Amino acid sequence: MTTQVPPSALLPLNPEQLARLQAATTDLTPTQLAWVSGYFWGVLNQQPAALAATPAPAAEMPGITIISASQTGNARRVAEALRDDLLTAKLNVKLVNAGDYKFKQIASEKLLIVVTSTQGEGEPPEEAVALHKFLFSKKAPKLENTAFAVFSLGDSSYEFFCQSGKDFDSKLAELGGERLLDRVDADVEYQAAASEWRARVVDALKSRAPVAAPSQSVATGVVNEIHTSPYSKDAPLVASLSVNQKITGRNSEKDVRHIEIDLGDSGLRYQPGDALGVWYQNDPALVKELVELLWLKGDEPVTVEGKTLPLNEALQWHFELTVNTANIVENYATLTRSETLLPLVGDKAKLQHYAATTPIVDMVRFSPAQLDAEALINLLRPLTPRLYSIASSQEEVENEVHVTVGVVRYDVEGRARAGGASSFLADRVEEEGEVRVFIEHNDNFRLPANPETPVIMIGPGTGIAPFRAFMQQRAADEAPGKNWLFFGNPHFTEDFLYQVEWQRYVKEGVLTRIDLAWSRDQKEKVYVQDKLREQGAELWRWINDGAHIYVCGDANRMAKDVEQALLEVIAEFGGMDTEAADEFLSELRVERRYQRDVY
């Protein structure tokens, strides 16, 4: 796009400022330019002089608020795309992350859109927990003047599919809100459903909200944008694996790898707290086994995203083979009329249990059938990348990114099975081999801005990963704030991940305290939550001193047990009852002093 620049004498910018402005906007799309224009208009109108000079609008325009509640970035992408659609339609829209939303203002919302994912056992994303609690509390206001719509993202391989969206949708209606549209529940392959839903939302809102004047069509309150980079989930960087080191002992029941990936001169940047997305390939041996069980050859042509590929290639690169789902089991049973599987159809609990305990290849082995190649790929879900908490800081490792990978290995009736991405990194990528990666930024898991703030890190197992990044960053920054680590695993001698590094940080005074829980080294099992209770008095002192608390690891059990221990510590040493302790912890969450990266 070429813009005719007025003579410099007529501009309020000097040549250097003009050059910087042109350089910054050269590659922007029309939608992005519109957003930038609106952003500067918003900045201008925050100035007192500008406020005084701005005439009052003739009539108040009802604003549209989009709340993004995202765990891995997908919900945020949908929310941002909807925001752009509404701006293009010249509607007044505000996009805000659930974690930044002042939820007590929800009663004043006229048009409210919620885009949410689900984590754990049907729980809302971390950034939406406080909002969810508020809406389900006695403090929630009536919403008779609010019209709303909900788009819910989930994974049908989990029992509580899209539960967070279902919760928000039902509660907003219960509080008196009017549904603009019926809720949409989208599976892993959500893009088509999201595109259709966005179009319907725009049409519905056009009749509700008048078209804005140019100065009103502004995307205000936009936070936690997908960071600008030439590399993304859909356009990953082809990097190289430089280190693959087993960091559990020879006799450990766990196979945990320290993986280092060379980013080269890509310029890819990340921060402690971010995740690394890894696109993996299925094991060729697994592909071969599945193809042969179905009496196929593997060279049959199939269509994937408009391209014709041999079946073997399609299965290796494009379809999920290591995670079964209730839908796949049900569809396979119906398609093959399997006498073993048909009795499960219609029984959600039995389907979920079977899918959780029986990989796709073993389902086919136990209930053999003959499918053509197209029927097979229509049965499967698209392959999706896996996210790993980043275990390094670029202040220390520069053009590298490190992750801590727990390799999933198990047997099904004597046959070795493994996780798709973890075994890809551990077993099938050779040194200097190619790995397609991208950064998934997570602004809801960040070190305190003030380097003097104390930090409490709770990360058993591979949950230790982001805290290695945190400590590298705190050491590089020479941050004077105290640091306290709680770590746990089965055995001290076999499972003390990054032991030498933690001991060095303690010796250097960077790590102020470390408490370790070894669950199998004594008769009575000890976990990190037990250590929290044991150190309750000191923990409360740190919290009173303004400490930020971070939890990383398993969402289903560990995170809940840790939160219960924190509530007990707060109640006992803070002199609160259960309800007050819960409110206190919720306030810490709202203040970003209690952050979790759980999965």
UniProtKB/Swiss-Prot annotation:
The chain positions of domain Flavodoxin-like read: 64-202
Reactions catalysed, semicolon-separated, are:
hydrogen sulfide + 3 NADP(+) + 3 H2O = sulfite + 3 NADPH + 4 H(+)
Recorded family membership: Belongs to the NADPH-dependent sulphite reductase flavoprotein subunit CysJ family. In the N-terminal section; belongs to the flavodoxin family.
- Tell me the ranges covered by the FAD-binding FR-type domain, including all copies: 234-448
So, what pathway does this thing act in?
A: Sulfur metabolism; hydrogen sulfide biosynthesis; hydrogen sulfide from sulfite (NADPH route): step 1/1
Q: Which residues form a coiled coil?
A: none
**Its quaternary structure?**
Alpha(8)-beta(8). The alpha component is a flavoprotein, the beta component is a hemoprotein.
GO MF entries: flavin adenine dinucleotide binding; FMN binding; sulfite reductase (NADPH) activity
The record describes the protein's role as:
Component of the sulfite reductase complex that catalyzes the 6-electron reduction of sulfite to sulfide. This is one of several activities required for the biosynthesis of L-cysteine from sulfate. The flavoprotein component catalyzes the electron flow from NADPH -> FAD -> FMN to the hemoprotein component.
Q: Which residues bind FAD?
A: 322, 356, 386-389, 404-406, 410, 419-422, 599
Task: Please list the residues that bind FMN.
Answer: 70-75, 117-120, 153-162
One biological process term from GO is:
cysteine biosynthetic process
| EC nos | 1.8.1.2
Keyword Electron transport in annotation: yes
State the needed cofactors, names only.
Answer: FAD; FMN
What name does UniProt use for this protein?
A: Sulfite reductase [NADPH] flavoprotein alpha-component
